[in-house]
Each structure stands twice: as structure tokens, then as C-alpha cells.
């Protein structure tokens, strides 16, 4: 994903920002995007980044946390959603792509009832706070009204 999006922004005025708490993941991102420009890398928590006031985001790819145990990841995902809505950081008509929503691990390992797994709290919250559901499959796409 990082390489593909990195290639897509080449020759544009689009800034591509990748954030991860794990420095090894950021180093891997740097390796796979070597030679590309318009990319910023930040080793920090998603919550710190989202609350930093870095301006408006047109496209946000959320790939938060682990699939097991699911509850801490779902709670983090909700906190991220609260920051997204509360700080008004998504531009009008901006898009959020949430990955791994329908991953079956939480149902199998944690006996999770929700079909939304790690996004079981964040999706309902975002839908009540200015976002529309555009696609509801393995990945979920939301768009700001």
C-alpha cells in the first residue's frame, strides 16, 4: 500500500504522510519507498498525530492495531475516530479507508459478535458525526459530508 500510494503522488503537490508507533515499520516504509518524494515519515502514536493539528486530510488510511485481542484495538480505533471528528481534520468530501474491518480473527479467537471487529465502535461513531458510508466490505470507506 505504501509503495503504491507513494508512486501515485509523484509529480503532484500531494503530501503523503505515514505514521507508525513502531520505528521498524517506518524503516520498512522508507525501504519500500526509496527514491520517491513527497513522503513524510513519523514515528509516533496515531492519537498524537491526529491531535497535532497538522492541517486537513483528504484521504486517511486507518490500519490500526492488532486483531487479537480485539477490544483494546477497538477502543483505540474509537479514540482515533473521536479525534478525527473532534479536531475536524478531514476535509469536506474527504475519505477514510479502514482496513481489516471484516477480518475473521476476532470472531474466531475472541468470539466477537460484531461484524466490524476493530471498527465496531468507530464506524457507528463516525456515522453519527458527519460521515457517510460509501463501501462496506472487508475494508470500509467513509466520506465526510
Where are these regions (language model features)?
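C-terminal substrate-binding/active-site "lid" region of AdoMet-derived donor-dependent transferases
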Residues: 66-145
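A short acidic, Gly/Pro-enriched loop at the edge of an enzyme's catalytic core
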Residues: 52-59
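Generic enzyme active-site microenvironment
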Residues: 18, 61, 97-98
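A generic alpha-to-beta junction signature in SAM-dependent methyltransferases
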Residues: 9-10, 53, 88-90
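Catalytic metal-binding/acid-base residues of hydrolase active sites
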Residues: 22, 47, 65, 101-102
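Conserved proline-anchored active-site loop of SAM-dependent methyltransferases
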Residues: 59-65
Amino acid at each position: 500500500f505504501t509503495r503504491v500510494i507513494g508512486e501515485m503522488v509523484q509529480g503532484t503537490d500531494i503530501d503523503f504522510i505515514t505514521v507508525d508507533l513502531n520505528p521498524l515499520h517506518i524503516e520498512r516504509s522508507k525501504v519500500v519507498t526509496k527514491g520517491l518524494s513527497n513522503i513524510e515519515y513519523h514515528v509516533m502514536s496515531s492519537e498524537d498525530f491526529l491531535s497535532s493539528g497538522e492541517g486537513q486530510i483528504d484521504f486517511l488510511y486507518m490500519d490500526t492495531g492488532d486483531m487479537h485481542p480485539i477490544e483494546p484495538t477497538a477502543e483505540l480505533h474509537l479514540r482515533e475516530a473521536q479525534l478525527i471528528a473532534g479536531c475536524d481534520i478531514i476535509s469536506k468530501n474527504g475519505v477514510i479507508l479502514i482496513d481489516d474491518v471484516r477480518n475473521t480473527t476476532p470472531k474466531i479467537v475472541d468470539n466477537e459478535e460484531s461484524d466490524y471487529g476493530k471498527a465496531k465502535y468507530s464506524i457507528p461513531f463516525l456515522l453519527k458525526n458527519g460521515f457517510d458510508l460509501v463501501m462496506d466490505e472487508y475494508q470500509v470507506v467513509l466520506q465526510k459530508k
